[in-house]
Amino acid sequence: MGTRIDIIGWGGDGMSIVNAVVGVVARHEDMWSVFRPSSEVSRLNSVVASAGGGGGASCCGADSAVAGPGLVVSVETDRLLRDALALAEATGGAFNPLIGPLVAAWDVKAMRAAYVAGVPLPPAPSERVVEAALRVSAWGLLSRVGERRWAMGTPVESVGGADAPSPRLDLGGIAKGHTADACRDLAVAMGARGVLVSVGTSSVSVFGTRADGSPWRAGLRDPHGGPTSVAGVVELPAGDMASLSTSGDNLGPLGGVRVVCAGSAVGPLAGSVAGSVEDRRARETLRETSAGGGRIFDHHIIDPRTGYPAHAGVRQVSVVASSGVLAEALSTALLVDPSIDVPDVVAHWARETSAPASAKVVGLVRAES
């Protein structure tokens, strides 16, 4: 998944649990990575078919190869895709699994690199480019057209051409949370009496307590401070399962959370350049850079509803929820729209999954004026 994964726990055979967890991570990478052409997500992106036509294909072997449009996916991918659509609807599109064309239009990777280096940001895309990407980023283009069969349509008003963008699925916004939960659940099934799994340090799943009976605790980094600055510490529910997700505008390759465990940490905090000379230069560059008719934007987080960088004045959001998928979607959505009604999203999620659900915002850091 292009990031670090840490596991801390007690009970059961530690080495066997770690080896099994590695297998889960590898399997999820094989299914959902947009960088692997053979993954189910990549294959779905490559299928040019809508619910009304096109050829069928299967990810799951001959037993599931039925004629029809789109792509037949595994049971686990089917569940994650259904979750993605449910959360896109519940958040009014603030979370969007089809944001890929907009990310490409804004060249977010280059934007992040420029931010870290403290150099001028790459040129903003034209209004026409943004509008074209926005049309094919509508989450409603993704649909379940049969048993485990999924297709992506093309908007009627979409402009053709060799360089015209096409819908692009990316489950990265919730896959880490799902993987953290799956690894935790497997560890518990294998005898762990207390376990913490951290995927990228921005997605954390826990069960039980630490070996001394105290609750698991996670430190939330301070996006306005240095690389080891902590804005607060969250105690995760003792004796139960819980998931924590942090989304922010400057999360580095190591994520945004660290585990506070008797003075030690699972990995360094995010934003290794925060507070440095390079970071100050980058902040000045961001303040001086305008886009979209003179609009000043604060970071590289794209609002999938408008097609432009979010300007809600929020730097970082942390959510604790009963599900890693729910926590990730909420932290992402609240970053672009802090007015989202969390109880409504949770209620919608509970109806869709037919399971009790809960979520709570445990940290929200606003941008400095």
What spans do the regions from the language model cover?
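Mature catalytic core of soluble alpha/beta enzymes
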Residues: 1-369
